[in-house]
Amino acid sequence: MGVDNLQLEPSVTPWSVDGSIDYDKLIKKFGTHKITDALLKKLKSIIGEIHPLLQVDFFFSHRDFDWILDRYIQGEKFYLYTGRGPSGMSHLGHLMPWLFTKHLQDKFDAPLLFQMTDDEKFLYGQDNSMEKIAKYTQENILDVIAIGFRPDRTKIIIDTKHIRYLYSMAIEIAKRITFSTAKAVFGFKNSTNIGMIGFPAIQAVPCFLPSLIEKKPTPVLIPAAIDQDPYWRITRDIAEKMGYYKPAQIHSKFLPSLESSGKMSSSKPESALLTTDSSEVIENKISLAFTGGQPTVSLQRKLGGNPDACPVFSYLRYLFDSPRNSTERAINCRSGNLLCGECKHDLSSNSVIFISEFQKQREKAKDKVSEFIYEGYSTETIG
């Protein structure tokens, strides 16, 4: 994913994330709300626990998550909606919002619509053929199923396959969003193809499909990385005019690149741990990973490291360490009592185990694909 449309420092768009991200500044820029202790307390009072990804602040921002909880308390169910742009093989950064989405599905018994935006990836990538995107779509679907979503509560929408279920709603949405608005939000230029200009209306459709399925306005919660927020911003602007609730969101941070700044990217395999990587490849990538440590052992012992700038620390914190262990690891890093090689060893061993187990579930998913594919709201209800 990469585009030169929005010139942010650093750059954060639905197609590109470059540089080191200041998430507090991003909250202000996008106009979202920080997840507070009070909101977490409210969530815990409903489901009895706080997911580790909330405890370590990986999910950090929201729009109307408090409203979703209020509606749920009042007895109104909500749908989940998230997705994937199939431009390559999936990596651990993709899995993290999906793992959290599964947690929400389990705790709230919420139906999930999962959108595969194969059309977007074809339109955006100059070198992407439909054949290549179709291959990645099928591969990515296996990753989604391997997460463990319930087939009776989960339906996967493939835009090009299911456009007949999306188009009527898409043009209703498109009619209400001006080019001026889309240009301001996404930074479209004269060189932008007209397919990309119209695509945001397609991505907005699953925000409102649950209302068609349920035959009444139905709340929707979108767990996704913060770079996708511009889509929901324009969708929220028109939702009530169309007779629907504004979609709520809960935003995650990015799993950083193994190479240093920016996010993990499947278009740069050396920067990411892919779900299809062998144990040897995983170990090699981690051994070469950038760290926040000093150039020599003696300097590390003397000066300590910087876990805040270390992708190895981030992976351990968000994926494998408990919040308490992560805090202890950071203290030991800064004091010089912990060396980068020790953290790399911990990450390597944990990643090999996690990905090898995930690959077993991925293999089993090949026999389950048909159970998850969407068949249209007119013939099937998943709520």
Residue ranges of each PLM-predicted region?
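Small-residue-rich helix-loop
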Residues: G305-A309
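Short glycine/proline-enriched loop/turn "hinge" motifs that connect secondary-structure elements
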Residues: L69-G75, Q105-K107, P200-A201
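Non-catalytic terminal extensions that flank enzyme cores
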Residues: M1-G85, K155, V220, R236-S287, ...
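Short, conserved phosphate-binding/catalytic loop or strand-edge motifs used
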Residues: F114-L123
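Divalent metal-coordination and catalytic microenvironments
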Residues: H91, V144, D227, S261, ...
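Histidine-anchored nucleotide/phosphate-binding helix
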Residues: G93-F114
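Short, glycine-rich nucleotide/cofactor-binding loops
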Residues: G85-H94
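Divalent-metal (Mg2+/Mn2+/Ca2+)-assisted nucleotide/phosphate chemistry catalytic cores
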Residues: Y124, M130-A248
